[in-house]
Amino acid sequence: MSDEFVIKPESVSPSSNTSEWPLLLKDYDKLLVRSGHYTPIPAGASPLKRDLKSYISSGVINLDKPSNPSSHEVVAWIKRILRCEKTGHSGTLDPKVTGCLIVCVDRATRLVKSQQGAGKEYVCIVRLHDALKDEKELGRGLENLTGALFQRPPLISAVKRQLRVRTIYDSNLIEFDNKRNLGVFWASCEAGTYMRTLCVHLGMLLGVGGHMQELRRVRSGALSENDNLVTLHDVMDAQWVYDNTRDESYLRKIIQPLETLLVGYKRIVVKDSAVNAVCYGAKLMIPGLLRYEEGIELYDEVVLITTKGEAIAVAIAQMSTVDLATCDHGVVAKVKRCIMERDLYPRRWGLGPIAQKKKQMKADGKLDKYGRANENTPETWKKTYVSLENAEPTTAPASKSEEKPLIKEVEKKEVEQKEESKEESKTPEEKKDKKEKKEKKDKKEKKEKKEKKEKKRKADDDESSEKKKKKSKK
């Protein structure tokens, strides 16, 4: 056999270039490894290889909003064109404003809130009401209007006209024509900033007055106008092509997976067996962790992903990267907003020995349907099984001063238990006498309270009548 058909042994393994992997799997080999062992489950699919129905229902469209229709109208049109159940957008644009409007479809609408709060970028044309003495004044005025600014919504707005603080992160003057009193500038700002108000403030600062002539949004959150921007006509044409020729390539081109909005988040990779538990709202624990990113701090927003690159949920980190590397147990992250549908992956909880025994005892009637003890429950189970459902997390007392109240509480409980045992040992006649005494005592207390109220009311009436007499004498 010739040498060209033989695979020769090598000491170096071929490197896979993960920088070209799609979406949330990019630079996967640079993630820190917690565990290399897990059982792959064939459920789920890579975001770009989902079947068309689930691809559309977990997709986002970076739409170039036309001038004149409102954002809600545009979103309603897309809902009608794609024949989907739900649509939402990443932040309202005024009717005359054009540019990036991220339209989320069905399952992706769960990310709308996070995109509405993300930063925005605009290109704006401002018309000044008079010529400037020095053309450089406009650039200097824009520089002054960066940072935290007070803004009141314009006269015609959909919200209450309250004074609010909004931040302008950066701004650049692109062009200025002093003869025509028109300036074009770019601004990066916080969500909820009114560019119309900014233009009015700019005119006031320059001493000539001004207003906004035209506006275009060039970035909204994670997507800019360079990231696969499509028009309403593109959406309509793609749906028409699919309906008439069954060619889904155009629909796949205009719709992007929802994972594109989460590329900026720190990632935590979850084992396939833990995915469905997280979808049902469980906290992610250390045993369910596969890989995690550098630089995660406590209470950071992170995205939980599967080994196929699907987003499971947006979560709040309960451990930093350092803790994740060293801890052998504990909560990694709490779910803030679940994205994935339940039961896409199979259930993999309740398979331990105690859980299986509990299941069997429920079936035999030795426990009730909630897993609580009943009259048929064996004594050994009652003594050995510890329910953690209502147990509060116990921490070691920091000092002796904290120990004392705990001891007192234990003593108090012991006394209560003794009293209860005494109560049980009493005869029915003794119990009846005690009940009657208690009722008499309660009646007496009520009577005393009523008398006190009456006395107070009479005293108040006497005071008011005296005051009236004094006034009449004057």
UniProtKB/Swiss-Prot annotation:
Job description of the protein: Catalytic subunit of H/ACA small nucleolar ribonucleoprotein (H/ACA snoRNP) complex, which catalyzes pseudouridylation of rRNA. This involves the isomerization of uridine such that the ribose is subsequently attached to C5, instead of the normal N1. Pseudouridine ('psi') residues may serve to stabilize the conformation of rRNAs and play a central role in ribosomal RNA processing. The H/ACA snoRNP complex also mediates pseudouridylation of other types of RNAs. Catalyzes pseudouridylation at position 93 in U2 snRNA.
Gene symbol of the encoding locus: CBF5
Keyword set for this entry? DNA-binding, Isomerase, Microtubule, Nucleus, Repeat, Ribonucleoprotein, Ribosome biogenesis, RNA-binding, rRNA processing
Protein name from the UniProt record: H/ACA ribonucleoprotein complex subunit CBF5
Which is a Gene Ontology cellular component entry for this protein?
A: microtubule
List all Basic and acidic residues biased stretches.
361-372, 400-433
Q: Where is the composition biased (Basic residues)?
A: 434-456
Residues forming the PUA domain are 265-340
Similarity comment? Belongs to the pseudouridine synthase TruB family.
> Which PROSITE patterns does its entry note?
PUA (PS50890)
The ranges of the sequence repeats are 431-433, 434-436, 437-439, 440-442, 443-445, 446-448, 449-451, 452-454, 455-457
SMART domains in the cross-refs: DKCLD (SM01136), PUA (SM00359)
Q: Which residues form the active site?
A: D94 (nucleophile)
GO terms, molecular function: DNA binding; RNA binding; snRNA pseudouridine synthase activity
Give the originating organism.
Kluyveromyces lactis (strain ATCC 8585 / CBS 2359 / DSM 70799 / NBRC 1267 / NRRL Y-1140 / WM37)
Where can this protein be found? Answer: Nucleus, Nucleolus
Q: What class of enzyme is it?
A: isomerase
> Any one Gene Ontology biological process term?
mRNA pseudouridine synthesis
Which CDD domains does the record cross-reference, listed alphabetically?
PseudoU_synth_hDyskerin, PUA_Cbf5
- What is the protein's quaternary organization? Component of the small nucleolar ribonucleoprotein particles containing H/ACA-type snoRNAs (H/ACA snoRNPs).
Q: What is its EC number?
A: 5.4.99.-
